[in-house]
Amino acid sequence: MALMLVLFFLAAVLPPSLLQDSSQENRLEKLSTTKMSVQEEIVSKHNQLRRMVSPSGSDLLKMEWNYDAQVNAQQWADKCTFSHSPIELRTTNLRCGENLFMSSYLASWSSAIQGWYNEYKDLTYDVGPKQPDSVVGHYTQVVWNSTFQVACGVAECPKNPLRYYYVCHYCPVGNYQGRLYTPYTAGEPCASCPDHCEDGLCTNSCGHEDKYTNCKYLKKMLSCEHELLKKGCKATCLCEGKIH
């Protein structure tokens, strides 16, 4: 079964200049993900960064907002539990990954997402972290090729020095152990989806997921009529020609 790398990101290690909003009037309510403008900022920032990957990616899906995941992300943020949620609390019709950001400053969503993405500096594509203690799992989830839905929530946790708690959920989940350091396929943008491309990102998402990492092999060995594949390899069996 596919395994997920469990990581969290401590925003307090970043310089205050990156985290602190320049506007003195900025309040937590302005970051509420119930606002359409905030949802658009989060989705747009993710898509912008997915277009910027190096080496360029041939099969990165364009991301969109997921309202069910928004509910889950906000509920977890409200708990002020500074650790990852169990997988059952971040599952919609798909299992979702999770990035956490904690800050003593009221950071913009774009700053939080950029902080995760900046881990790319510590990763050699298709090889691994440049240093043994480097954290790169937030970056790989942000740019995981088959993830096409995102939603987030934020809460204030006054009892903690890192009082602002940001949670984003990514569906379907990324960071499979089998290819953790290869979050997408290197190549010309949209080379894997020439007929389904929008500004360098693919639009042929699947809507299903594989629960096993060897579904392609299982399909050849057993065929999609087998009960094992019907339950655990829906993407492989139902999404031919789509990114999954």
Curated annotation (Swiss-Prot):
Belongs to the CRISP family. It comes from the Eukaryota. It holds the Pfam family CAP. The gene is Crisp1. Residues 206-239 form the ShKT domain. This is Cysteine-rich secretory protein 1. Glycans are attached at N145. The lineage of its organism: Eukaryota, Metazoa, Chordata, Craniata, Vertebrata. Mainly found in the cauda epididymis where it is synthesized by the principal cells and secreted into the lumen. Binds to the heads of spermatozoa. Also expressed in the submandibular gland. Residues 1-19 form the signal peptide.
